[in-house]
Regions:
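Redox-cofactor binding/interface segments in oxidoreductases and associated redox assembly factors
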Residues: 190
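Conserved small/polar residues in nucleotide/adenosyl-binding loops
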Residues: 199-201
Length: 201
């Protein structure tokens, strides 16, 4: 695991374990937590090893959605308990398959990639920065874009988590400041509604 991704996994592991204990104690079921990773696989090179797309970018942009609805749960074939590394790899797999530098695939087999958040929101931002900023003013510069979410939890379906779950997340899994410190994005963009609390960031 590469440097930044390892730092993220080390950040998530103890916090997720503590949050999971709280959720289990209350009988609350959630989907997989949304954990970032920036080591991608390109051209079937064998594993998620390339962080250079992010670290070498001249402009690093982190784009926030509200919450990851229908974020899948990684499956363990051998019965070993799922760890934060597995959740990070889940993100890296999605990104490796769907993020193409200047755009997200809109015709991917992954249902999340067909979401308007990517096809219109995220792709629109990338296109605007490329067409009106980089191509015109800084043609020799390269941008990289990273998807994040204000809330890291989902219960599946089309609805967000309850107030109780948000409060537990804020208390035990408040990781966005550390994510920003580790990844050092130059720009933060929020594609969220006005009802989202500022306490998460």
């Amino acid at each position: 695991m590469n440097k930044l991704t390892k730092q993220l996994a080390n950040l998530y592991e103890p916090k997720w374990n503590e949050l999971k204990q709280q959720l289990d104690a209350k009988g609350i079921k959630v989907q997989a937590p949304f954990m970032l990773g920036v080591a991608l696989e390109h051209n079937n090179q064998g594993g998620y090893v390339d962080e250079s797309w992010w670290t070498d970018a001249d402009l690093k942009v982190m784009v926030f959605g509200q919450e990851a609805l229908n974020w899948p749960i990684p499956v363990s074939d051998d019965g070993i308990q799922i760890q934060s590394d597995d959740f990070v790899e889940l993100y890296q797999r999605f990104y490796s398959d769907n993020y193409k530098g200047d755009y997200f695939l809109k015709d991917s087999d992954n249902h999340l990639a067909k979401n308007k958040f990517f096809s219109m929101g995220f792709n629109g931002i990338m296109s605007g920065i490329k067409d009106f900023v980089l191509d015109k003013q800084y043609p020799d510069k390269k941008a990289a874009y990273l998807w994040n979410n204000i809330s890291k939890l989902s219960v599946g379906g089309r609805y967000g988590v309850s107030k109780e779950i948000h409060e537990l997340e804020e208390k035990y899994f408040h990781v966005i400041p550390q994510e920003i410190e580790i990844l050092k994005p130059d720009v933060l963009i929020f594609l969220t509604g006005p009802e989202i609390g500022r306490a998460h960031v």
